Amino acid sequence: MTQAATRPTAEIGNEDILAVARRQVLEGGQGLSRDQVLQVLRLPDDRLDDLLALAHEVRMRWCGPEVEVEGIISLKTGGCPEDCHFCSQSGLFASPVRSARLDIPSLVEAAKQTAKSGATEFCIVAAVRGPDERLLAQVAAGIEAVRNEVEINIACSLGMLTAEQVEQLAEMGVHRYNHNLETARSFFPNVVTTHTWEERWDTLSMVRDAGMEVCCGGILGMGETLEQRAEFAAELAELGPDEVPLNFLNPRPGTPFGDLEVMPATEALKSVAAFRLALPRTMLRFAGGREITLGDLGAKKGILGGINAVIVGNYLTTLGRPAESDLELLDDLQMPLKGLNASL
């Protein structure tokens, strides 16, 4: 059953939405509906601190104090045939990113460094529509090599999959599969035209049926309306993923979204809290774009406003916060790292 299955959808009337959320989400464990999330997103900025405090209470009650740390690595960079308008790895745009592949020894070394940071999850990513036989063989070899030398969970993000490929990855022992819906179904055609939102959903359904954990989130600040952001939260709640990574658009030169403005920090924090109230039991991960959108102070507020997982180090084509900075912040906030056994 997804977190949206039994939630009410009626309007609340004149009752304060945070009072409703305290009763419904914090005390009752039921995520907010689409209409309720929209009310949260429309709250004035002077309610932000109250909103973040409630989202933190919800996270602590339904997820606990632990924070999961993950590192990611690009096995194949650039040259992607898809036209995701935010992505500098598309071969269709005049971006500075060039196609490259990582060798297995470098992959193993990256996994070792990730584990040293305290991370329990190592995600192997490839810029493709979906994996071909050559890439799957390389992934299989990489997973085996990492397993021989590093104690860490292995996740993959390899685009859209066939049923056979899903089974192959499950047999390789992939712990979690990431495939982001990216945005609301109604806004998706403004972001991608070379495949559909439904194709992504189908891959996620097969991943769940195969017994792997589902990781699915998206990018906020791509021009979607608040209504569409609330729609996206409700769609994720219907899917019921184990993890939702929240990215914020970091406009990349040469892409169709390269000239968009960065989301205001207050709007980003409000969105983090709203997604926590829609998904009270889900792992909510700070992902790409938080550095440019929120800065150091915003990162702290986000972790105290519903976030319970982070990506440490760099992202696929952009720089992230140093792992030490995130780990020091978590230590200062007295938030323990999730151990490997708890992640298995």
Swiss-Prot record:
Pathway(s) the chain acts in: Cofactor biosynthesis; biotin biosynthesis; biotin from 7,8-diaminononanoate: step 2/2
Binding positions ([2Fe-2S] cluster): 123, 156, 215, 285
One Pfam short name: BATS
Residues involved in [4Fe-4S] cluster binding: 80, 84, 87
Matching InterPro entries: Aldolase_TIM (IPR013785), BATS_dom (IPR010722), Biotin_synth/BioAB (IPR002684), Biotin_synthase (IPR024177), Elp3/MiaA/NifB-like_rSAM (IPR006638), rSAM (IPR007197)
Domain Radical SAM core: 65-290
SMART domains according to UniProt: BATS, Elp3
Main EC class the enzyme belongs to: transferase
Catalytic reaction annotation: (4R,5S)-dethiobiotin + (sulfur carrier)-SH + 2 reduced [2Fe-2S]-[ferredoxin] + 2 S-adenosyl-L-methionine = (sulfur carrier)-H + biotin + 2 5'-deoxyadenosine + 2 L-methionine + 2 oxidized [2Fe-2S]-[ferredoxin]
EC number: 2.8.1.6
GO molecular function, one term: biotin synthase activity
Keywords, sorted A to Z: 2Fe-2S, 4Fe-4S, Biotin biosynthesis, Iron, Iron-sulfur, Metal-binding, S-adenosyl-L-methionine, Transferase
GO biological process: biotin biosynthetic process
Protein origin, superkingdom: Bacteria
Cofactor(s) needed: [4Fe-4S] cluster; [2Fe-2S] cluster
Assembly information from the UniProt record: Homodimer.
Function per UniProt: Catalyzes the conversion of dethiobiotin (DTB) to biotin by the insertion of a sulfur atom into dethiobiotin via a radical-based mechanism.
Family: Belongs to the radical SAM superfamily. Biotin synthase family.
Protein name: Biotin synthase
